Swiss-Prot record:
Homodimer. The tRNA molecule binds across the dimer. It is an enzyme of class 6 (ligase). Pathway: Aminoacyl-tRNA biosynthesis; selenocysteinyl-tRNA(Sec) biosynthesis; L-seryl-tRNA(Sec) from L-serine and tRNA(Sec): step 1/1. One of its GO terms (molecular function) is ATP binding. It catalyses: tRNA(Ser) + L-serine + ATP = L-seryl-tRNA(Ser) + AMP + diphosphate + H(+); tRNA(Sec) + L-serine + ATP = L-seryl-tRNA(Sec) + AMP + diphosphate + H(+). Catalyzes the attachment of serine to tRNA(Ser). Is also able to aminoacylate tRNA(Sec) with serine, to form the misacylated tRNA L-seryl-tRNA(Sec), which will be further converted into selenocysteinyl-tRNA(Sec). NCBIfam families: serS. GO terms for cellular component: cytoplasm. This is Serine--tRNA ligase. L-serine binds at T235, S236, E237, E289, S388. InterPro entries: aa-tRNA-synt_IIb (IPR002314), aa-tRNA-synth_II (IPR006195), aa-tRNA-synth_II/BPL/LPL (IPR045864), Ser-tRNA-ligase_type_1 (IPR002317), Ser-tRNA-synth_1_N (IPR015866), SerRS_1_N_sf (IPR042103), SerRS_core (IPR033729), tRNA-bd_arm (IPR010978).
Amino acid sequence: MLDIQLLRGQLSQVAERLALRGVTLDSGAFTALEDERKQLQTRTQELQAKRNALSKQIGILKGKGEDASAVMAEVGQLGDELKACEQALPVVLEKLNAFLAGLPNLPQEGVPVGEDETGNVEVRRWGTPRSFDFEVKDHVDLGAALGLDFDTGAKLSGSRFTFMRGQIARLHRALAQFMLDTQTLEHGYTECYAPYIVNREVLVGTGQLPKFKEDMFWVLRGGDEEGGEQYLISTSEIPLTNTVREQILAADALPIKLTAHSPCFRSEAGSAGRDTRGMIRQHQFDKVEMVQIVHPDASNAALEEMVGHAEAILQKLELPYRVITLCTGDMGFSAAKTYDLEVWLPAQNTYREISSCSNCEAFQARRMQARFKTAQGKNELVHTLNGSGLAVGRTLVAVLENYQQADGSIVVPKALVPYMGGLEVLRPAS
């Protein structure tokens, strides 16, 4: 959430920066709500002061034995108006809060300006795409003989679900374990196991709600139809980041670095017709997430570090990739700056997103009221960052396609052999 003081003092500048994201700020609506708030607060204070003065006057009159009925009647009238103001003010404040909750984060200075993914800027590449001396197959055709079963997934749950069995299920698990070990043992993250179902206020904290409800899977508890809203997580960023919600942390507790492997559930609203073949876009997929809670002065450096942590996985797997900076029009709602990592997929002859790392600055912290105490004893908002380290399913796709052999077998990347019990090649079922 944006700082309301920023809008109050620099409304036109905020509007200009939001316009870079393709968002039109309704300055008139904000100004009208602000005027109403100020009028109600001013009138409430005036009425309270007048009531207090009249109450003293009543005491003086009664002390003298004089008639105070007229003044008491006036106090009664003031009380009615004061009650009306006190009831109206929270309504206006809630409208202001809802207005702010619908605004995305402001892009950092230096983020490339653009309307969509065509405005993204490549930063660097690593590795050289392999040259094949045979016709390349995609992961769907390769996986069919290795236990990747989209038909069973569709029979069980509908489109965009996958069923895995045997050696490919083992490879999927090996990838997740390898990623977790790298992030915890080499990069200093604390491994976590978090709930996959969360309450509404948790999603408000990280910015998925209220704006993106249609992207979520909603949960209805049997026998509790009147219960509160709950949702399946779309990323473990949600529970990990919210561990500091409504807390005041000691400065020396920062940075906090958390990681978790979890399934992620996304309705993919608005994605009809996109990536309908294979595992690229699924309703359920696994991901190893990285989250950092840091001092505001450290968040830009933490973002660069986090990107390096995601890159390390791809480098260990020897998968070619590139790093791009997302433009203003392609960033996520809560992000001030985002890097995407895109892995090379031979069958598509292009790079596809496999990780997204974002600095959200104080945007999520303000929504969560996550703060730390400075050396001067002042409470300030922390900065939050999140990144994929990595998306497990898309990494599986990249391994299958980049390590395929002419006979349909898959060479296991060296880094994964210990996680596969020494198995070095996946061979198609005869």
